[in-house]
Amino acid sequence: MTCPDKPGQLVNWFVCSLCAPRVCKLWSSRRPRTRRNLLLGTACAIYLGFLVSQVGRGSFQHGQATDRGPPNGHDIFKVPFSEIPLDGTLAPPELQGNGSTLQPNVVYITLRSKRSKPANIRGTVKPKRRKKYAVASAAPDQEVLVRPSLIQQEAARAADAEVPGYVQGYLTKVGERPWRVLRGPGVRTRGSNLQQPRARESNIRIYSESAPSWLSKEDIRRMRLLADSEVASILPISKSGTRLLVLEGSTSGSVPGCGPSPCGLLKQPLDMSEVFAFHLDRILGLNRTLPSVSRKLEFIQDGRPRPIILWDSSLASASNDSHSSVKITWGTYQRLLKQKCWLNGRVPRPEWDCTEIHHHEWSKMALFDFLLQIYNRLDTNCCGFRPRKEDACIQNGLRSNCEDQTSVTLAHIIQRKNDPRHLVFINNKGFFDRSEDNLNFKLLEGIREFPESAVSVLKSQHLRQKLLQSLFLDQVYWESQGGRQGIEKLIDVIERRARILITYINAHGARVLPMNE
């Protein structure tokens, strides 16, 4: 008798050889029938339990092998296992002819996917050492370089990007505050092989297919120039803290500059209303202000955003006392309004003492100044409202000159050299905290006509929507005012003043005319 080599036959042979003599001896011995039946039943129960455990084990392995099958589910791996016995004595039809037998776990093993090469176990592969760049401490009069990433360097090399160098020069020292230029992304210093790609996200965000219709392509280009261009140098131009920023770039096209490079006027954080004034001017269809954006600069220690206004070299030179290209007193201004100089192409008479400024320009300026309550042009002495202690007219002691208003000189009346008929609105610092019972109606004195394009926008219900859409483009300004909640409060003030202005126009019988001369 040979010993079987299969697991099922081996177990059966072991049980039969071990238990058969004992069962025969037990059956032939003289013992009580009850005890003999109990022992026989116990042995049968043990053997039956063993068979059940073998059946459960085979079913569990078959289920696991089916679940571990390949995800593509090709038919070549589908084998009819329902006809294979548990002990594996019967092979599939295609293997029975050659007399070979099939092990019950052979099919399960072949269903597993095989690796072509062993996997890399974490910790067994030596990591690549990254090259580190040590940033040397810069001297007080030297520039600070920012270490670029290796990925950005490779991207720049792959694109063969030629990064322009910086304008050489020294930073002008202003007072005791340390001003320094931090080299931002997209630049390369001479003598250094550290470079970064020029592409970066602009602070002027346009998520739609096109910009708002009231902003021209030239406006968007100039806004991005002011918001994203690197600063080459700084020149102080006034005691009030206004500085001239020389920006990197070219003055090609219609971008005016202060030499070979474009420039921008950097003002104080309290002048942030100039950004709002620029967008309001474009929405009303006046187009008399210079592009203005809000920006944070690295060389300013407080980190607060400040307005930057485009420097326009085409503006006519201004006098030192009134900051105007033409000297006009309040009395002369009222006479010019009555004469309606250059209206309908009519040449004024010499005795009228008309300037080269068109009559409609005064109406546009008065409407614009009233909405923002700008008093530094038509009411420099603050005679039309109750000023605060921090207002310039109180600080300079000009309030006492209100008794003789006819001799008061207007300020910030600016024209262009090549276009003296039209005004350019500069220094547009507005005031949103002035109550409705303290509005300066002196700004509207003598005005009998108002521009139709602006009045139609004020009468419509779209002023808020347009202001939100336009101011959203300037990300730094939007965030500096507290997001939409803060912008909504500013728009509330403008809407209330617009309703008051419409009431004033109707009450005084002023005409609303198209002013597209």
UniProtKB/Swiss-Prot annotation:
Keyword Flavoprotein: no
Membrane topology: Single-pass type II membrane protein
Compartment(s) of residence: Golgi apparatus membrane
Record's keyword terms, sorted: Glycoprotein, Golgi apparatus, Membrane, Signal-anchor, Transmembrane, Transmembrane helix
Main location: Golgi
Statement: the UniProt record of this protein carries the keyword Magnesium: no
Gene Ontology annotations for the cellular component aspect, listed alphabetically: Golgi membrane
Residues on Cytoplasmic side: 1-36
Transmembrane segments: 37-56
Pfam families tied to this protein: FAM198
Glycosylation-annotated residues: 98, 287
Database matches in InterPro entries: FAM198
Segments in the Extracellular topological domain: 57-517
UniProt similarity note: Belongs to the GASK family.
Protein name, per record: Golgi-associated kinase 1B
Biological source species: Mus musculus
